[in-house]
Amino acid sequence: MEERCFRLGIKTNYKKEIFMILNNKQNKTEFIVSKMDELVNWARKGSLWPMTFGLACCAVEMMHSAASRYDLDRFGIIFRPSPRQSDVMIVAGTLTNKMAPALRKVYDQMSEPRWVVSMGSCANGGGYYHYSYSVVRGCDRIVPVDIYVPGCPPTAEALLYGLLQLQKKIKRSRKTLYWLQK
């Protein structure tokens, strides 16, 4: 029996289709897991705890973004002093060859899931010191980077925009559902 769908104006047998979809056990499991993923991602994106890894002048702009004018606390972003308490690392400034092992060690100490934000042209690709013998040409050679914030130094608004983009990326992730399908 066909029934009319009021929103689309299309005739469909939607009751039978929904029953067929929910009758399958795997579809029920995927539905529950996807809703659980949405709930977990909602909690994760609303409580980002970044750890600062300030290496140069970009760190001043990072401190500026945490001050009262931009107030990252209203987005649930609270800076943490320890890598074991944080889930986001903001790399701000010129990364030297001598500092690269320390960056990797701090990254490894962070608990899963963890994200990295590369802030400024020096952290993104070496910046003005790109051709220097002692500079790593981008922190993505040491740790996997999720968000790049351009600028020299980037403004506090740019960092805020980058962190909001990271929240959108977290909202779209489906780690549990992918794990279930393997």
Swiss-Prot record:
Which Gene Ontology terms of cellular component type are present?
mitochondrion; respiratory chain complex I
**Signal peptide: which range, if any?**
none
Q: Where does this polypeptide localize?
A: Mitochondrion
BP-aspect Gene Ontology terms: aerobic respiration; electron transport coupled proton transport; mitochondrial respiratory chain complex I assembly
UniProt keyword annotations, A-Z = 4Fe-4S, Electron transport, Iron, Iron-sulfur, Metal-binding, Mitochondrion, NAD, Oxidoreductase, Respiratory chain, Translocase, Transport
Q: What EC number is given for this enzyme? A: 7.1.1.2
Q: Which InterPro entries match?
A: NADH_UbQ_OxRdtase-like_20kDa, NADH_UQ_OxRdtase_20Kd_su
Tell me the residue numbers annotated for binding [4Fe-4S] cluster. C57, C58, C122, C152
Enzyme's top EC category:
translocase
Catalysed conversion reaction: a ubiquinone + NADH + 5 H(+)(in) = a ubiquinol + NAD(+) + 4 H(+)(out)
Q: What is this protein called?
A: NADH-ubiquinone oxidoreductase 20 kDa subunit
Q: Which gene encodes it?
A: NAD10
